[in-house]
Each structure stands twice: as C-alpha cells, then as structure tokens.
A protein has these predicted regions:
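Extended, EK/Q-rich alpha-helical coiled-coil segments that serve as long dimerization/scaffolding arms
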Residues: 1-51
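Hinge-like oligomerization/junction regions that interrupt long coiled-coil arms in large cytoskeletal
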Residues: 34-203
Length: 203
C-alpha cells in the first residue's frame, strides 16, 4: 500500500509540474499576444494618422521604433495658427510630407529600406544637413504695405526645429492679399517669393 501511495504521489507531482509548465507557457504566449496586439494597434494608428500620405511615408513611420533617428514628417513638426494655415501649407508645398531625420546616416538607412522592400520613394530632411545654414533676408520687407511677416515667423515648433522652419520658410514673405502681393513683387522686380493668406503664390 505504501508503494502504491508513493507512485500516486509521484504521478500527482508530475501532473502538478505539467500544470505549472502549461500555465507558464500560457502566460508567455499571453504576453506575446499582448505585445503583438499592441504592435498591431500602433501600426493601425500610424496607418490612420498618415492616411493622406503616400505608402512610402507610412512604411517609414512604421519603422520609428527601429530607427530612433526618425523625427517625423514636416506637417507634424511645424504648426501655425488657423488664419495662417492656408498660406503656410502653400508655402511648404510638397515639403509638408518630407520626413525629418536626425542625420544623413538615418536617411541613408531608410532610403535603403524603401528600395529593398520596393515601397517607393520619400524625401528626407536630415537636421544635421540643415544646421548652421545662413539664410539672409531683407527684414525691411516686413514693413511693406500688407506684409504679415516671413513665413517662418508665423509658425510654431520646438526650439530644436527653429532652423528647419527657417530653412523651409525663411525666404517666403506672407502678404494679406493678392493686390498688395503684386505691388510688392513689382517694386522688387519679382525677385521675391510671396504667398498670400488665401494661398496665392508669387515667385
């Protein structure tokens, strides 16, 4: 009888060990499932957030965890008040969808990623390539009749992106309406890039 009880105890211990192992496996799988669900939710959010963008831009933004040097698209970095939105969007043009990176190496890696996977092309703006660029403008232009200011003066961004805003918008004068814009353009022999609050562009 003692031997029988010992065998039974062994079987119970083995069964208990098996149950514990299965529970551990289930916990591990649950963590994996939760991790994948979180990742899928993150990818879904990126897809929805960049719905109006090209496929290549969405694919790059999905790599943000892998490439820490991805800063974001210009539209996420440079903001402006409602009354200037049309003018700033026009001034930025296609660059509004450019992808900002910390440096050229990150941009190079992402270009290779797009090529290898045949995801198309994207335009990158490495902050390291913009840093220190001298952008000279005639500040007296802001005193012209109807002038609102240079476009980079009408946007908001974190201080680390001030040079980016100046690089993209620092040479574009925002003017209140087309009549004043034409008058300023004529006075300066059409040598300026001007955008009106309604989005008319002169260059």
């Amino acid at each position: 009888l003692g031997g029988t009880l010992s065998d039974r105890e062994k079987r119970q211990l083995a069964a208990r060990d098996m149950i514990n192992k299965l529970n551990n496996d289930i916990s591990g799988l649950s963590r994996v499932v939760m991790g994948e669900s979180s990742r899928l939710e993150s990818l879904k959010n990126i897809t929805e957030r960049y719905d109006g963008y090209g496929n290549s831009i969405r694919k790059v933004m999905e790599q943000k965890d892998r490439y820490k040097g991805i800063v974001g698209v210009v539209a996420d970095i440079i903001k402006t008040q409602k009354q200037y939105e049309t003018a700033i969007e026009t001034a930025l043009g296609g660059t509004i969808q450019n992808i900002v990176t910390d440096n050229e190496e990150t941009a190079k890696g992402l270009i290779a990623f797009l090529k290898q996977n045949k995801f198309g092309r994207a335009t990158f703006l490495p902050l390291s390539a913009i840093s220190g660029r001298d952008i000279r403008v005639d500040s007296s232009l802001t005193r012209e009749n109807g002038a609102v200011g240079f476009a980079n003066q009408l946007v908001e961004c974190d201080s680390e992106f001030t040079e980016l805003a100046r690089y993209l918008l620092g040479r574009i004068l925002v003017v209140d309406n087309i009549d004043n814009a034409l008058a300023i353009a004529r006075r300066h022999n059409h040598s300026l890039r001007i955008v009106t609050l309604e989005g008319d562009m002169l260059s």
